[in-house]
């Protein structure tokens, strides 16, 4: 126990006193506790505002709100439940954005200092910033493994869980009053803390604020997970990034261990294994190990208890799956991945005796999930539920070049993102739907027929949807046309993709152009 206490002993000076007492003084307590705020009738324009809200503008806004509260009390407002007219969203968003900017300052400075020490290592691995770099990691490290723990990280149901998580990083009490005010307001009005979709927390009216809170929640979860993982492994990781700037860590881990057994060392030996890999993107994580299903079940039991007892979140049964890598698919980052055994028969002959030797070659296969992609196209009104292309009536007022450019952009980004697929047939199906939908949209605009329109436009238009990616590869390999065609049919991983394709998220289809 003393050994682990030494590892977990951190400097309490890393706790931060944020700038709220200096900037806002008593206004924070007024916002958090003064119910007169709900009786305010402040007229405010609905005009746009700068997303980069400064702390000065937020301070002025809070001062105006505080003054108007007293004016409304003296005026004896006849409608006490009227909340800042129809501009409640504007006030909350302005203040919460200023809150996000300020709380990010100490974490950003700490992160920059940490990255400066890793500058030489990062210069050698700058390509690893791409999402596609995860799949070569799968190919190199997962091909000899057998079991995968597919995990969906649950979100905190109660706002107080987020506030408590935030308290481990700071000691400024006024910050918690303001944070609690925003969380309860958003939770009561919009239920943003328990989103129906896994990624709807990122598409709220203030994504920066909730993104910061969500990352704090995941960081809290992974810091405990990585500590126990490193202590239980024979090959311990040398990275200390997930553990910097934590307080009261030892007591939390000790309480967590008491849920399982009384002896910390007896608990850790249950998970000792030399080969284990962990990968996460947003709210989905993958934990892979070799042929030890008992070990994976114990890690599943550990994660469920961690969420239930430490984060007070009830984990649904469908959030953790134990899959066999060579029998089940892993749905990760818009790809369906699994291991595959290819048998290679070799004929060997010694003198008069001939032998047939079967060699099993292990490969990692990645394919495009056709059904979710068709579901996204159906939601975006490019096809029906059966996958039959339909026209896009909302673009009928646009020019022909604009409509064609929109469809081409979607196809180009889709081909670019799914270029690592082992089988291109599903990708061709999606591009066919978009191609026919583009034609039908133009036909509907010109009130013509498909045959007449294609005859006037020519067949070159249709070929562009299929030759765009091959043209890009021919520019990369100008002297080897055969090489570019072979790469186009095979798997290609790009190192310039820094965010997941919106089509994969199944929420929206439009992609930001490069």
UniProtKB/Swiss-Prot annotation:
Transmembrane segments: none annotated. GO terms for biological process: mRNA processing; RNA splicing; tRNA processing. GO terms for molecular function: RNA binding. Keywords: Chloroplast, mRNA processing, Plastid, RNA-binding, tRNA processing. It is found in: Plastid, Chloroplast. GO terms for cellular component: chloroplast. Its main location: plastid. Pfam families: Intron_maturas2 (PF01348), MatK_N (PF01824). InterPro entries: Domain_X, Maturase_MatK, Maturase_MatK_N. It comes from the Eukaryota. The keyword Metal-binding does not apply. Belongs to the intron maturase 2 family. MatK subfamily. Usually encoded in the trnK tRNA gene intron. Probably assists in splicing its own and other chloroplast group II introns. PANTHER family: MATURASE K (PTHR34811:SF1). This is Maturase K. The lineage of its organism: Eukaryota, Viridiplantae, Streptophyta, Embryophyta, Tracheophyta.
């Amino acid at each position: 126990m003393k050994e682990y206490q030494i590892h977990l002993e951190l400097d309490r000076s890393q706790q931060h006193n944020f700038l709220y007492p200096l900037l806002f003084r008593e206004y924070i307590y007024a916002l958090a506790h003064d119910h007169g705020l709900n009786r305010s009738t402040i007229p405010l324009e609905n005009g746009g505002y700068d997303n980069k809200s400064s702390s000065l503008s937020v301070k002025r806004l809070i001062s105006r709100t505080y003054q108007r509260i007293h004016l409304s009390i003296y005026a004896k407002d006849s409608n006490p439940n009227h909340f800042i007219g129809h501009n409640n969203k504007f006030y909350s968003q302005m203040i919460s954005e200023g809150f996000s900017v300020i709380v990010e300052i100490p974490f950003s400075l700490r992160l920059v200092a940490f990255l400066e020490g890793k500058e030489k290592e990062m210069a050698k691995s700058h390509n690893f910033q791409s999402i596609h770099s995860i799949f070569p990691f799968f190919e190199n490290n997962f091909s000899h493994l057998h079991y995968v723990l597919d995990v969906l990280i649950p979100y905190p149901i109660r706002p107080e869980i987020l506030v408590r998580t935030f308290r481990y990083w700071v000691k400024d009490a006024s910050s918690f009053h303001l944070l609690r005010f925003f969380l309860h307001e958003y939770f009561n009005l919009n239920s943003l803390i328990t989103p129906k979709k896994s990624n709807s927390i990122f598409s709220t009216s203030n994504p920066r604020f909730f993104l910061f809170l969500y990352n704090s929640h995941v960081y809290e979860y992974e810091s405990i997970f990585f500590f126990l993982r490193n202590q239980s492994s024979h090959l311990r990781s040398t990275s200390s990034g997930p553990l910097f700037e934590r307080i009261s860590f030892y007591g939390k881990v000790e309480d967590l261990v008491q849920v399982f057994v009384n002896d910390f060392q007896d608990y850790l030996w249950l998970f000792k294994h030399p080969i284990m890999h962990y990968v996460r993107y947003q709210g989905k994580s993958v934990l892979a190990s070799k042929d030890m299903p008992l070990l994976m079940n114990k890690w599943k039991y550990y994660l469920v208890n961690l969420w239930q007892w430490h984060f007070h979140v009830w984990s649904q049964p469908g959030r953790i799956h134990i899959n066999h890598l060579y029998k089940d698919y892993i749905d990760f980052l818009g790809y369906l991945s699994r291991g595959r055994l290819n048998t290679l028969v070799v004929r060997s002959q010694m003198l008069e005796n001939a032998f047939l030797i079967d060699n099993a070659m292990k490969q990692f296969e990645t394919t495009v999930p056709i059904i979710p992609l068709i579901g996204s196209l159906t939601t975006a009104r490019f096809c029906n539920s059966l996958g039959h292309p339909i026209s896009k009536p909302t673009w009928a007022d646009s020019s022909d070049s604009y409509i064609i450019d929109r469809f081409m952009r979607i196809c180009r980004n889709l081909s670019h993102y799914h270029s690592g697929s082992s089988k291109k047939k599903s990708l061709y199906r999606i591009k066919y739907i978009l191609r026919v939908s583009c034609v039908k949209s133009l036909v509907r605009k010109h009130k013509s027929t498909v045959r007449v329109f294609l005859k006037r436009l020519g067949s070159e238009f249709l070929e562009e949807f299929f030759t765009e990616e091959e043209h890009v590869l021919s520019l990369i390999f100008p002297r080897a046309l055969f090489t570019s065609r072979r790469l186009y049919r095979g798997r290609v991983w790009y190192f310039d993709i820094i965010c997941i394709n919106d089509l994969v998220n199944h929420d929206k289809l439009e992609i930001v152009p490069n």
